[in-house]
Amino acid sequence: MVDKIEKLLLCDCEGSQKVDSTALADATGLKCSKVYSELCIKNLDIVEKAIQSGDTAICCEQQSSIFDEIAGNIDKDSPIVFDIRDRAGWTVDKRTVVPKMAALTAEALMEKPIQKAKDVTSQGRCLIFGDCESVLEAAQILQETLSVTALLDPKDGDEILNVNGFDVVLGKIKNAKGSFGNFTIVFDNLQELVPSGRGPFKWTHAQDGATSSCDIILDLSKDDALFPASEKRDGYIRADVGQKTKFTSAILNASQLQGTFEKSLYIKYEASVCAHSRAEKPACSNCINVCPTGAILSSGETVTIDPGICAGCGACAAVCPSGAIEYEPGPISWILARLDVIQKYYKGAGGKNPFLLVHDDHGRELISFSARYGDGLPSNVIPMQLDAIATFGHAEALAAHASGFEEVFLLTGPKSDTDTILGEAEIANAIFENALRVVEVNDPLELSNIFEGLAKRANKTQLSKPMGSRRQVTRVASKTLNPEKEILPLPDHAPYGAVLLDNDSCTLCLSCVSLCPSGALGENPDLPQLRFQEDACLQCGLCSNICPENAISYEKRLNLSNAALEQTILKEEEPFACIECGSLFGVKSSVERIIDKLAGKHSMFSNSDATKLIQMCDDCRINAQYHSDNNPFAGGERPRVRTTEDYLSKRKDH
């Protein structure tokens, strides 16, 4: 918990919820105030004293703006506030909510990861394009605050009668890239206005491939958006001009985008463990495939992540098999810590049969509406809010079950990355039945119904507290949940499995060993062996792509036995003994195969001496070549030393 917090300021919101201050104090170990009824109205003096003390958290999040204003008036930091009313107190469930309130309190007072950010500067350069009339209307308004360029279709050039305060060009956008404060636009058929002369405006000759930059793009066209997941691209504002409210809102939003802003940084990337590519052969591209904004691109053996484009959905971190990508605002270690605290305080206060409900902002709104107008959440359903619910993958779901949660629900919304979430749920459910229940609820009054009618699970014989990387967490949790099983089949996109080797095709060239990004494939420096450690395999596909004999395939599975942690021999052969010194080298079958293909069949191996070179180790081969009649390192024959007699013998007068 936050060290400075020692007290809780409680309110029952005009008696609409039951708050037991004594029981809550016993469950949390914190001092609890008496239960007030109108902290935000009649008891503001109590709130001011609590803020002045600096050691009190207020159990009312709904009126946080009032509390922040009070803190500002007395020159104090804003107090810690959190909700126990909508998430716990307002419910038709007659069972005690003290364990749930204790868990929510303890979780709210945990130290949170630091949110990193960078400064983004916008000079207010705004490009507007789309319908001529709408573009000119928007440009006329925005030119008072921004540096505006209006892009019109070439056919609309004759409609320009007067231009004041902004630039007008004709053309078509070929492509665009970048993000807020740093967009780059490529135009075709670009024509600039010629300001001189009398009469109708004139335009320069059309130019293709012209490039320009801007800070803001206001898209008023009816064409496809310039960017994938365009609603997540900062600085790119798209509006339907047919809806006046949205059109006006877009103009207002664009007018505010000048100055210096903070852009959150979401992703931590460790290139050294990335399994994207090796030796120009493709391998894992999970993060590229799931990124909705196109922020992740291939860059040789690794990937590059553009922080300006990244919208922080977290899907890449969930599907990364090696842990090269981590979602910094909420890494798996933070989620596991929250699960542990919730369990500890919920069960410590006597709570039983806990359900976990993972949700985002949309889910929080549903919970609030359900609490006010419906049945609210049952007393054993503990909500946990995440900024990006796509980061809650199979490892987190399994860890929740292994730590004691009876059921785990993930509440999606209209902006959720459903494909990634369902893919992770498929893996989790293959390991443990219904480990992650993905639900979509549009009617808040129906929210409480999703927790009804579930068959009670058999009591877990043991619980665990998984820690470490996603792979380590998955293994520990899976062993806890499947104590009698060793091999669990998994779907095709799972990052766990075995390498299957066609022994007849494999020549033990070991090219797969040198390029395996996780070290799952290994060799024996003393003998021709191909070894494999299943627990380390990422199923990235690199070894299959690199194998010249197409001898490698995969089996998607999770091996929970200890054998998965050890190196097993996929193939081994007898080494070849040098015919000169007897030292072992190479693979006997390969050497014999080479001799069979070359001896007497190739000009360089037409005699037995040349063939013997293949059967020698490196040292003996060099020695034999050096002393051979056909030594490639030898110089030409040295000429005989000439004497006086040689010269005189050639004279005619001699």
Language-model segments: which ranges?
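Basic (Lys/Arg-enriched) interaction patch that binds polyanionic ligands
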Residues: 290-323, 511, 515-518, 527-546
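Flanking helices and flexible, charged tails adjoining ferredoxin-like Fe-S electron-transfer domains
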Residues: 2-3, 272, 315-411, 549-654
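Short acidic loop-to-helix transition motifs that present clustered carboxylates
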Residues: 38-44, 303, 389-393, 530
